[in-house]
Amino acid sequence: MIWRLPLLLVCCAVLSGCTPSGFVARQLIRAPNTFPQVVSPEPRLYFTFPDAVLDTFPLQRATVGAPAVTLAYRILPPADYRTRLTLTNHSGSTGPVPLYLFKGDIPGTPTPFTAHPRGTVVLLHGYGLSQDSMIPWALLLAEAGWRCVLVDLRGHGNSNGDRIHFGLQESADLTALIDELQRREQASWPVSVMGVSYGAAVALRWEMEEPRVRCCVAVSPYGRLGDAIEGLRAGYVSWLPAGIIRRASEKMPSLVGAGPGGLDPMEWMQFRPVGALFVAAGEDEVATPDAVRALHARAAAPSRVIEVPGARHEILPFRVEELRESVTDWLRDHGSAPPP
């Protein structure tokens, strides 16, 4: 399985040519799963997980919300999966790139938490990706006792929706999904959330709006969306004029019904601070360490920020050996209490 950081910016450049920034802005809020996979950069890493995960824990769907959206999700129950990681290299056209091989025993051996989970953790992927990218973390956290819900956010993976809202609508989607999982007796309390990049921004927004979210882990959250988009441009498609992207990012909030800065977690945190474990990558050009620390400075207690030196944006979620203890400790300490 190939992991790639889908660059809608590249698609926009190909599609727009010399078209106005307003067109580019509309493409940037378009559902990523509606774009053809014709243009993509060479992956900066590859990863695999046991194929049996997909068959043993099948994809499910729930139609929720108003207007309705059908969200695809997958549930991994607590069990001992004996998850293990081998790090090697894949030969790319420009040299070796990391290959993360996650292995495990599926369907796993029952543990005391299989019948009585610590709680539910909802895992949210990055922009343009799908729930598959969070399967390694789901295996690890399920081993530690949590029931894990993997979700394709609207416009991603196997979920529908013609546009994305950078957290404004997605938070309501997730609340409606948890309500439906309660009805199906598939959710348990307390509810925690772990998100990566775009998914981290959605996770923070959801924590602000949903009191049933008791704990959050935000991995590489951007502080300001425009800065993150510029980081993608500079890091991946530096030949694309910065002015086009800057003007497009300035127009995006109004296209989803928000005011200036309305898609920026830094602005949200100023007025509705929440606590979280913030995780930064030392060499991140999309969600820079300074941006993550600035979010932490505005966060409510309890909060903590940790940094993985030398890691880049796309690598950080797979540095599980360095992050596993901090993440599980945070969830245990702040997300395992009984609901009020």
Regions found by a protein language model. Give the residues of each.
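An N-terminal hydrophobic leader/cap segment in hydrolases
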Residues: C18-T111
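Conserved alpha/beta-hydrolase
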Residues: A138-N160
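Alpha/beta-hydrolase active-site loop
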Residues: I164-E185
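Hydrolase active-site cap/lid region
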Residues: R205-A258
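Short beta-strand/loop motif that positions the catalytic acidic residue
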Residues: F271-R272, F278-A280, D284
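Acidic catalytic loop of the alpha/beta-hydrolase fold
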Residues: E283-A287, E314
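Catalytic histidine-centered segment of alpha/beta-hydrolase-like enzymes
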Residues: A311-E321
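Catalytic active-site module of serine/aspartate enzymes centered on a nucleophile-bearing elbow/loop
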Residues: R319-P340
